[in-house]
Amino acid sequence: MPRTHKIEDYRNFGIMAHIDAGKTTTTERILFYTGKSHKIGEVHDGAATMDWMEQEQERGITITSAATTAFWNGKRLNIIDTPGHVDFTIEVERSLRVLDGAVTVLDGNAGVEPQTETVWRQADKYKVPRIVFVNKMDKLGADFDKSVESIRDRLGAKAVPIQLPIGAESALRGIIDLVRMKAVVWDTDALGAKFQDEEIPADLKEKAEAARNYMIENAVELDDEAMEAYLSGEEPSEEVIKKCIRKAVLTGAFYPILCGSAFKNKGVQPLLDAVVDYLPSPVDIPPTKGIDFRTEEEVERRASDDEPLSVLAFKIMDDPFVGSLTFCRIYSGKLETGMGLMNSTRDKRERVGRMLLMHSNNREDIKEAYAGDIVALAGLKETRTGDTLCDPNKSPVILERMEFPEPVIEIAVEPKSKADQEKLGVALSKLAAEDPSFTVSTDHESGQTILKGMGELHLDIKIDILKRTYKVEANIGAPQVAYRESISKRTEIDYTHKKQTGGTGQFARVKLVFEPGEPGSGFVFESAIVGGAVPKEYVPGVQKGLESAKENGLLAGFPVIDFKATLVDGAFHDVDSSVLAFEIASRAAFKELREKGGPKLLEPIMAVEVVTPEEYLGSVIGDLNGRRGQIQGQDMRGNATVINAFVPLANMFGYVNNLRGMSQGRAQFTMLFSHYETVPQVVAEEVIKKYA
């Protein structure tokens, strides 16, 4: 079927927030008022439409980003639900990559919270235009002005209210629309579906005038004509104000602030109007960049049906009815079912079996999709998160890849029976395909299966999925830290491998210079061979030997990182040399670093932020110091104190329960991986003794 909406009428947006700011409730209300949900799902009773994995319904947090299509005022909305829990920032990054705009939801009582900052910074990285919805204005202690202030202070963003609340806490009646200078008041009986315009209450008139002037002054700055008219005393029309606010959102000049209470059904329709009026369509954002598959030159793809097809797979989910679903954003061109595609990231062929339009948990089969659409494809075999799909015959392209953070925490899993062993293998490969920040490996020595993730909650949920969805019974080890190793000295190692016992022998000599690298540089290999001391075809053998040797460590079997190896000299034999011989030689040379390279143990250091009421400050800081934490600074946020610290991950296990106990459940914390650092000698000796 032909296109039903012009691409200019699309709004691909996500809703981002701190955990518990009311993001899922806001999404639910949007689906309810746009007519896509027949009953309102409440997170409190575990019934929200978007949160459709059992684990999410129980924990009341959103884990997977489900994509949903809805309609409002003749525009087509594709809503991507993003998780707000810090263990799932990978999901947030992934959904930000495919969004054109976002609504940031704040809790009117708390303002900007730690995870708000995290997702805001990620949105800055991808230059996502945003509007802000201050939610929960019906809550005790909700304070709109303070929330707006927190956006300025904590995010350093220019916040310009375009609405004000009427009443607060339980007396919240509606909002003042500063663009139209009208009060919008909701009828409490009709589940928020009925509302009407009224005159602005007398006691708020002055405040509204001042807020409107501030809004207009900031808006007209973006348009010379409007600015001139305003300076000569002419009041801008509603149309001009909207045009200027839209420009501000697209350029990031300022962020419009709206307010309401999704739970009490107030303020959601004006929020939808703002999404339509101010957030970008696919043609308002810069063309997406990519690399030509054949020439490797940079190319651009405009959001148009006439351009060659380019599609980004941003999420893979296992669906109980359809099997594996790959959520995709079509950046350009037209996609049809039955089409043969090329996965240009992996140079593999794919065929589109079924194409579905998702409404959080119902699905609609479609035959065609166009630039700007977000669809789920069934039946793809080779595609992983972050891969590009395109037309093999029309200038295939690789869109920019997404970068995923290192998993820093691991647990061992042992299946309880032979039958579980088989189920475990299948389940884990599916989970790893769905989530690039979750990796599965086998410990060569113990034969155990090792799962690595971003945090305790991340791994808990994976284990939960194994047990519930895949019915795997397994014994779970205690969480372990993903230590790493490195070297501290520059050293030259000359190693000759020869094995000549009649018949074809083996011979290879390598001279390698090893030196410590910058933190985060990983492993760098370079060949500085001149004059053919080691023929070109054997150099990959040297690199391969080092690649495999570094995985087994020097001290305690942890991968070696942040070093450079340069092949400077060597020797070969016409008959006895081979790629394998050079691989064995470089592997043996690497092992000598144990004695000569000053090996050291590294541990992951987490950036921890604790928000605690003043009275527990002493105990919290004392406790962090006891965990080898380095306090980086503290701030006031309302009447709470915010402590920032670097703490080794090894000392953060079970911290959530400790902190609760210490603060009677009133303090919270978030942590993100920051960097690797050398482990103090005393601690290192214990770790090496345990693992070596």
Swiss-Prot record:
InterPro entries: EF-G-like_DII, EFG_II, EFG_III, EFG_III/V, EFG_IV, EFG_V, EFG_V-like, G_TR_CS. GTP binds at residues 17-24, 81-85, 135-138. One of its GO terms (biological process) is ribosome disassembly. GO terms for cellular component: cytoplasm. The keyword GTP-binding applies. CDD domains: EF-G, EFG_III, EFG_mtEFG1_IV, EFG_mtEFG_C, EFG_mtEFG_II. It comes from the Bacteria. It is found in: Cytoplasm. Residues 8-283 form the tr-type G domain. Its main location: cytoplasm. Pfam families: EF-G_D2, EFG_C, EFG_III, EFG_IV, GTP_EFTU. Keywords: Cytoplasm, Elongation factor, GTP-binding, Nucleotide-binding, Protein biosynthesis. SMART domains: EFG_C, EFG_IV. One of its GO terms (molecular function) is GTPase activity. Transmembrane segments: none annotated. Belongs to the TRAFAC class translation factor GTPase superfamily. Classic translation factor GTPase family. EF-G/EF-2 subfamily. Catalyzes the GTP-dependent ribosomal translocation step during translation elongation. During this step, the ribosome changes from the pre-translocational (PRE) to the post-translocational (POST) state as the newly formed A-site-bound peptidyl-tRNA and P-site-bound deacylated tRNA move to the P and E sites, respectively. Catalyzes the coordinated movement of the two tRNA molecules, the mRNA and conformational changes in the ribosome. This is Elongation factor G. The lineage of its organism: Bacteria, Pseudomonadati, Pseudomonadota, Alphaproteobacteria, Caulobacterales.
